């Protein structure tokens, strides 16, 4: 979600009736609507929460000590906006585990791997996917982190990334998510108004001394390239990924 309340609201409007809600991590950081996003999450209360790397930062601010100054300022501002309740709930998030939902067994993982292992994205080696769930026998593995909506078949297993609600990277401006209906996986996307996100970013006084950084954030967000228009995201855009 990455602190994008507008995208989250759009998903919930499109899917008002659900039996079970799974969140795969990265809730309120790094985005300009951390408080609003936190309040929505406190209201909807996902049934399962998986710990993302940005959720870890929320619990341990020292993890950003070596980040660039502008990114540190962005996150330090966000830390001050977040309700204590969401911090306490974040402490209960799981890193990864097996779950049975509606009679279907899943292995859930945020998707962050050791830096020595290439990211689990389309065309990645088998080893990247196997690193997500070593020793696990679940045939369905759900993960996030890489902000691209895709599935990967490996033997009897299906690896599923439902994409990013709040920070797409493949040159599209949709909020991405997925549903399971009657045991069938359905990837979905929904458009939303980007202006409130931009307005929220413009109101962050702590970033006024970093105009190039805020311009870069806006350009990437409006173009659907959350971390910049570059490979492999340009290729993924051309191939139709969300």
Model-based region annotation:
Residues 21-26, 48-53, 109, 140-147, ...:
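Active-site neighborhood of phospho(di)ester-bond hydrolases with catalytic His/Asp-centered motifs
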Residues 3-87, 91:
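Core catalytic region of metal-dependent phosphoesterases/phosphodiesterases
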Residues 98-107, 154-158:
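Beta-strand-turn-beta hairpins that frame and shape the catalytic cleft
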Residues 126-160, 165, 175:
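Anionic-ligand binding region
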Residues 153-242:
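Acidic, His/Gly-rich catalytic cores of divalent-metal-dependent hydrolytic chemistry
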Residues 96-98, 108, 151, 177-179:
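Conserved hydrophobic/aromatic beta-strand scaffold that supports enzyme active sites
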Residues 66-73, 104-135, 168:
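Active-site-proximal segments of metal-dependent phosphoesterases and phosphodiesterases across multiple
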Residues 3, 29, 113, 148, ...:
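Short active-site segment of divalent metal-dependent hydrolases/proteases
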């Amino acid at each position: 979600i990455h602190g994008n309340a507008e995208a989250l609201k759009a998903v919930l409007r499109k899917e008002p009736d659900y039996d079970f809600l799974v969140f795969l991590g990265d809730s309120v950081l790094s985005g300009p609507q951390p408080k609003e996003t936190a309040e929505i999450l406190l209201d909807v209360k996902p049934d399962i929460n998986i710990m993302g790397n940005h959720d870890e930062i929320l619990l341990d601010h020292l993890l950003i000590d070596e980040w660039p100054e502008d990114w540190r300022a962005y996150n330090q501002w966000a830390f001050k906006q977040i309700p204590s309740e969401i911090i306490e709930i974040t402490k209960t998030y799981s890193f990864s585990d097996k779950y049975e939902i509606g009679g279907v067994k899943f292995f859930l993982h945020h998707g962050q791997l050791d830096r020595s292992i290439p990211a689990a994205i389309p065309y990645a080696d088998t080893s990247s996917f196997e690193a997500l769930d070593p020793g696990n026998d679940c045939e369905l593995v759900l993960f996030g982190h890489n902000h691209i909506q895709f599935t990967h078949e490996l033997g009897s297993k299906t690896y599923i990334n439902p994409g990013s609600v709040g920070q797409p990277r493949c040159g599209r401006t949709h909020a991405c998510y997925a549903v399971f209906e009657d045991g069938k996986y359905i990837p979905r996307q929904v458009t939303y108004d980007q202006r409130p996100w931009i307005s929220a970013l413009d109101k962050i006084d702590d970033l006024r001394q970093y105009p190039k950084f805020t311009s870069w954030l806006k350009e990437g967000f409006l173009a659907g390239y959350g971390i910049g228009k570059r490979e492999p995201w340009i290729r993924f855009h051309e191939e139709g990924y969300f």
